[in-house]
Design a protein with these regions (language model features):
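Active-site loop/turn microenvironments that scaffold catalytic and metal-binding pockets
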Residues: 1-45, 143-157, 177
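Acidic, contiguous internal or C-terminal segments within carbohydrate-active enzymes
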Residues: 68-117
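Extended, loop-rich substrate-binding clefts of extracytoplasmic carbohydrate-active enzymes
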Residues: 26, 32-88
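A conserved active-site cap/scaffold subdomain adjacent to cofactor or substrate pockets
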Residues: 121-162
Length: 188
C-alpha cells in the first residue's frame, strides 16, 4: 500500500519478522509486509480517524488513542500531532506521545509537496536540503540493520541545497536497496 499524506505509526519503517524484544520479553506484532511489520501494521495510524483537538488560522492539532494490544503493541498510547505554519511560512510538524506501559514508538508523516509549482514535471529538478548527518542502514529487504551510516561524501549528503536528479541515480547501495530516497535520514 501507499502511505500518501498520512501520519505513520505506531512504528514507522519495518520490523524484521514482526517481532522485537522489550524488557527481555518477545513481542510479536502483526505481519503485513512479506513476514515483516511495516508502518504500524494492517491497521496502523495511517488508517485511523484522528480527532481534531484544535483548529486555528495557522495551527491544526490532532489526537489519537491507540489501545493496549492494538496491532499487538503493548500499552495504551496517546498521541498528538501539531501542524503549524509560522511567520516565516515554514511548516512545523510536532509529535507528542505518552504510553502507560513500556513500548516502542517511531512516528513520522508522509506529506508530499510539489516544490516548484509545475504539476506536469517530475521531482528530479527539485532542490532539497535536509539537516541530516546520518541514515539508518538497511539491508536488501529494507530492514534496518541497527547501524548508522555517515552521509558525508555520499549521494545522501543533502545538508546543502541539492538537485534531486543529481544524486538519486548514483550507484550507491542504500539508494539501490530503497529504489530512491526511501530511507531514514537522521540528525545526531
Amino acid at each position: 500500500p501507499l502511505y500518501l499524506g498520512c501520519i505513520v505509526g505506531r512504528y514507522a519503517n519495518r520490523i524484521a519478522n514482526g517481532q522485537f524484544l522489550l524488557n527481555g520479553k518477545l513481542v510479536k506484532l502483526t505481519q503485513n509486509d512479506n513476514g515483516n511489520h511495516l508502518h504500524g501494521g494492517q491497521k496502523g495510524f495511517s488508517s485511523k480517524l484522528w480527532d481534531v483537538v484544535e483548529h486555528k488560522t495557522n495551527t491544526l492539532i490532532l489526537s489519537l488513542e491507540s489501545r493496549d494490544q492494538d496491532e499487538n503493541y503493548p500499552g495504551t498510547l496517546k498521541t498528538t500531532v501539531s501542524y503549524t505554519i509560522n511567520d516565516l511560512n515554514e511548516l512545523k510538524v510536532g509529535f507528542h506521545a505518552y504510553s502507560d506501559m513500556d513500548t516502542i514508538i517511531n512516528l513520522t508523516q508522509h506529506s508530499y509537496f510539489n516544490l516548484n509549482g509545475n504539476t506536469g514535471e517530475d521531482i528530479l529538478n527539485h532542490k532539497i536540503k535536509i539537516d541530516s548527518n546520518q541514515i539508518t542502514e538497511i539491508d536488501h529487504q529494507l530492514i534496518p540493520t541497527g547501524k548508522f551510516l555517515d552521509v558525508k561524501g555520499t549521494p545522501l549528503d543533502l545538508r546543502k541545497f541539492t538537485r534531486i536528479g543529481k544524486m538519486i541515480n548514483q550507484n550507491f547501495q542504500q539508494i539501490n536497496f530503497a529504489k530512491g530516497y526511501d530511507l531514514s535520514l537522521i540528525h545526531i
